[in-house]
Regions:
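Structural alpha-beta junctions
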Residues: 53-59, 81-84, 180, 184
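Glycine-rich phosphate-binding active-site loops on the catalytic face of alpha/beta enzymes
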Residues: 30-35, 79-99
Length: 240
C-alpha cells in the first residue's frame, strides 16, 4: 500500500521542478477487475495521504472503483479529495448484459462463471462466442476484460437495437452512480461556468511552486529516496 511518505516524496519533488499534477493515484487496496475480497479501497489511508498533500492542491484519482460497495464510494466522495474515479470494468460488464449487483460487481457461480441476463446487453450468440474464446485462452473472472480488444469490431457490428440497449444499460448505471453515490447531481452548471471562466477545458495548474529546487537536485532525490522504507506486501503473482 502507498504511504504518506511516498506520496510526499513524489509530489514535493515534482513541485520543486514546476510540475503540478492535477491528480495522484494511489495503491490503496484497489482491484483492477472484480473486487472479490470484500476489503476494497482503504478510505482512511486515502484520506491521510490526501490531507498530507493539501497544500500542493493535488486531487485524488481513484483506480479500481469497480466492485466497491456504494457505501464505500460514498465515503470516498465525502471523506477524501477524490475527483476522478475509474469504473471501466464495471461498465464493461454492465454493457455486456451480465448480472451485476448495485455497484457493478459481476456475479459469479461456484466455478467462477458469469451470469448473462437474457435479452440484455449483447446477443446470446455473441456471448456464447466470447465465452468460447475465453475458455480457449484460459481466461476467467477479471481476465474477461481482455475480450474487449479482440471482439471490438464484432460488438460494434451488432444490430442497432442491440447496441442501443448496451448503451442504455451503461447510461442507467452511470446516472445512478453520479446522482445517488458520488454527489454529482446538478453539478453540470458549475462545470460549464468553470470552463467559460477559464476560456478553455484546461483551467491550468492548481498548484504553484513552494518547494526549494536546491533541496531536490538529482543527488538529493536519490538520497531522500533511499531513506524511504515501506511494506510492499507479500511476494507472489496477484494478477486477477
Amino acid at each position: 500500500l502507498s504511504t504518506v511518505e511516498e506520496a510526499l516524496f513524489l509530489i514535493q519533488g515534482l513541485n520543486a521542478h514546476d510540475i503540478f499534477p492535477d491528480w495522484i493515484a494511489l495503491n490503496n487496496g484497489t482491484t483492477h477487475g472484480i473486487e472479490a475480497s470484500g476489503k476494497g479501497i482503504q478510505v482512511d489511508l486515502t484520506t491521510s495521504i490526501h490531507d498530507a498533500l493539501e497544500k500542493y492542491r493535488v486531487s485524488g484519482a481513484q483506480h479500481g472503483t469497480s466492485g466497491n460497495s456504494s457505501d464505500r464510494l460514498r465515503e470516498i466522495a465525502s471523506q477524501t479529495r477524490t475527483t476522478k474515479a475509474n469504473v471501466a470494468t464495471a461498465l464493461q460488464m454492465v454493457s455486456w448484459g451480465l448480472e451485476v449487483n448495485d455497484y457493478g460487481n459481476a456475479k459469479l457461480d461456484d466455478q467462477g462463471n458469469f451470469f448473462k441476463v437474457r435479452d440484455q446487453g449483447m446477443t446470446e450468440a455473441m456471448w456464447s462466442e466470447l465465452v468460447a474464446y475465453a475458455q480457449d485462452q484460459g481466461w476467467k473472472g477479471g481476465n474477461y476484460k481482455k475480450l474487449n480488444l479482440p471482439f471490438e469490431n464484432k460488438l460494434l457490428s451488432q444490430a442497432g437495437e442491440i447496441r442501443n440497449r448496451m448503451v442504455k444499460r451503461v447510461e442507467e448505471f452511470i446516472y445512478n452512480m453520479l446522482v445517488n453515490v458520488l454527489n454529482a447531481e446538478n453539478t453540470a452548471p458549475l462545470t460549464v461556468a468553470a470552463i467559460l471562466e477559464a476560456g478553455s477545458y484546461d483551467a491550468g495548474p492548481k498548484g504553484e511552486r513552494i518547494e526549494d529546487p536546491a533541496q531536490w537536485t538529482p543527488e538529493e532525490i536519490i538520497k531522500r529516496g533511499a531513506s524511504i522504507s515501506s511494506d510492499k506486501g507479500p511476494e507472489g503473482d496477484f494478477d486477477d
